[in-house]
Amino acid sequence: MKTLTTLATATAFAFAATAAQAADKVTLQLKWVTQAQFAGYYVAKDKGFYEEEDLDVEIKAGGPDISPPQVIAGGGADVVLDWLPSALASREKGLPLVNIAQPFKSSGMMLTCRKDTGIASPEDFRGKTLGVWFFGNEYPFLSWMSQLGIPTDGGEDGVTVLKQGFNVDPILQKQADCVSTMTYNEYWQIIDAGLTPDDLVVFRYEDQDVSTLEDGIYVLEENLEDPAFVDKMVRFVRASMKGWKYAEENVEEAAEIVLENDETGAQTEKHQVRMMGEIAKLTAGSDGVLDPAAYERTVETLLKGGSDPVITKAPEGAWTHMITDQAQ
């Protein structure tokens, strides 16, 4: 009898230990490839911030052929990172994505132009060729041109839109007068290719009042009806924002952590340290809480997107403070 009691006690302890070790799993799908743009999440994982919240987080890198909305719709992720225009477009098409946190306060998107083209202000775009990213990234640009009254179908009074790949070759090869860049990435690719800041003129979308919210955290609306899922997301957001704060304050270490997670080996230390420094400017002062005014500005910008707007009406229920309120 004593042996049976001892065995039962040992089994109970083993079960308890296993239960204690079984952290809640979360799968995160990034919007793009592994780089400092996502440093906060890699830092949170590396520094044990997720583990402290009893979470086992899998971070899945993105790429040109990976659509975060499609991934979450197919059950491949619990939470995704996306830009608000893409998320709102998906929502209008029937995929009920909800923004639960917004680590990025500012937009890093801009047009970078060669100074020798004579461009000094947006009015000088007329008659020029501009490289523009598509796949949902074109809508802030189209809205901007619409507000300026500049046609996007060519001609002396309009602009010729060059569908730009995810590189800066058009400006280097003089196929375009301006190209789309991010403050933390493609702009520096132009500099590394040999042009100098004095050779360039930049127009930040933030400065033109046509910026849209980028790199928000999204989940499916139906999952927010599950208290257990909500609790898991509260812990996830809290740990992620802790990761972002650490990354902002420890730029070089954060970049190194990103490099350690880059399975492709494509990233360099110089580029990632520089990128992390620029990313820190976009997340500075953020507590993860979405600013309703910035949201409304994004919606207004998208609704002004010319003849083919990304959304046709103001969305309802596309964001919530439920998670961030509890994560504070």
Protein language model features and the residues they cover:
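Secondary-structure end/capping motifs
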Residues: E225-G306
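Cleavable N-terminal signal peptides
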Residues: T9-A10, A20
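Conserved C-terminal helix/tail region of periplasmic/extracytoplasmic solute-binding proteins
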Residues: Y295-Q328
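Sec/Tat signal peptide C-region and signal peptidase I cleavage site
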Residues: F15-A22
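Bacterial N-terminal signal peptides that target proteins for export
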Residues: M1-A8
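Short, glycine-/small- and polar/acidic-enriched structural segments
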Residues: D24-Q164, P170-Q173, D177-Y184, F203, ...
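Periplasmic-binding protein-like
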Residues: P103-C113, T196-E225, G277-I279, G317, ...
